[in-house]
UniProtKB/Swiss-Prot annotation:
It comes from the Bacteria. Involved in the biosynthesis of lipid A, a phosphorylated glycolipid that anchors the lipopolysaccharide to the outer membrane of the cell. The keyword Lipid metabolism applies. PROSITE patterns: HEXAPEP_TRANSFERASES. This is Acyl-[acyl-carrier-protein]--UDP-N-acetylglucosamine O-acyltransferase. PANTHER family: ACYL-[ACYL-CARRIER-PROTEIN]--UDP-N-ACETYLGLUCOSAMINE O-ACYLTRANSFERASE (PTHR43480), ACYL-[ACYL-CARRIER-PROTEIN]--UDP-N-ACETYLGLUCOSAMINE O-ACYLTRANSFERASE, MITOCHONDRIAL-RELATED (PTHR43480:SF1). One of its GO terms (biological process) is lipid A biosynthetic process. Belongs to the transferase hexapeptide repeat family. LpxA subfamily. GO terms for molecular function: acyl-[acyl-carrier-protein]-UDP-N-acetylglucosamine O-acyltransferase activity. It is found in: Cytoplasm. Gene3D superfamilies: Hexapeptide repeat proteins (2.160.10.10), Udp N-acetylglucosamine O-acyltransferase, C-terminal domain (1.20.1180.10). The keyword Cytoplasm applies. It catalyses: a (3R)-hydroxyacyl-[ACP] + UDP-N-acetyl-alpha-D-glucosamine = a UDP-3-O-[(3R)-3-hydroxyacyl]-N-acetyl-alpha-D-glucosamine + holo-[ACP].
């Protein structure tokens, strides 16, 4: 049985799952759909047309699904936000709804961990197992692949794509696309190395060795796109193919590789 505090506002048309807890002074808008075992803590606001998956927690004063911060937005569609299962949305996070320039929805996959004061703008698409540290700021239409981590105080420019398994260091500023499985750092951020910490959590030594060799071929000799084309023709590794296809399909470009300074 769900528990809804008397001071909370749940508008007509909202669908509330089983064993949901809605704390004092929180708000759930019309046509919102709240999954089972969700906790909405004091003062959080879930706007209309937001879907939140089972076992998620929305912490105090987070605002999910308010209108886009886009000067061209004219209420032209009934937009919203879709969040997967087991999400953690911490205090004062803001997640804006989508626009007609996308499909109308800002989307976040399963197992998201979004730390306090982070911002996810309209039409962003976040995969599964995403971590945003405090004050990470995503502009409109940003895409993050599965298992990506964005460090604190890091802004990401609109339309940037970050591939699967990347690490974006804290206090960086990202304006170009980041190849899957890489670590990027700096202002402006550039690719520095493979994200070896992330790779070791998911892959065996053989696959990591293949990706390490791929990284050297792609970034340390010749033309990046030519290298990607050549590797694509010869590799059987699905992860290498992901890296190569990403390079060939980039629209914002790949930031120039810089050797890490170990001094």
């Amino acid at each position: 049985m769900s528990k809804i505090h008397p001071s909370a506002v749940v508008e007509d048309g909202a669908i509330i799952g089983d064993e949901v807890i809605i704390e004092a002074y929180s708000f759930v808008g019309a046509n919102a759909k709240i999954g089972n075992n969700v906790v909405i803590k004091q003062g959080a606001r879930i706007l209309p047309n937001v879907k939140i998956g089972d076992d998620s927690k929305i912490f105090s004063y987070a605002i999910v699904g308010d209108i886009p911060q886009d000067i061209s937005y004219k209420d032209e569609i009934n937009s919203g936000v879709i969040i997967g299962k087991n999400a953690t949305i911490r205090e004062f996070v803001t997640i804006n709804s989508g626009t007609a320039k996308g499909d109308g929805y800002t989307r976040i996959g399963d197992n998201a961990f979004i730390m306090a004061y982070s911002h996810i703008a309209h039409d962003c698409i976040l995969g599964n197992n995403i971590i945003l540290a405090n004050n990470a700021t995503l502009a409109g239409h940003v895409e993050l692949g599965d298992y990506t981590v964005v460090g604190g105080l890091t802004p990401i420019h609109q339309f940037v794509k970050v591939g699967e398994g990347c690490m974006i260091a804290g206090a960086s500023a990202l304006s170009q696309d980041i190849v899957p499985f890489c670590l990027a750092e700096g202002n402006r951020a550039s690719i520095r190395s493979l994200n070896l910490v992330g790779l070791r959590r998911r892959f065996d030594k053989e696959e990591i060795d293949i990706l390490s060799k791929t990284f050297k071929i792609l970034f340390k000799q010749g033309n990046l796109k030519d290298n990607a084309l050549n590797l694509l023709e010869s590799t059987s590794s699905e992860n290498v193919k992901k890296m190569c296809n990403f390079i060939l399909e980039t629209k914002r470009g790949i930031p120039i590789y810089k050797e890490k300074n170990h001094g």
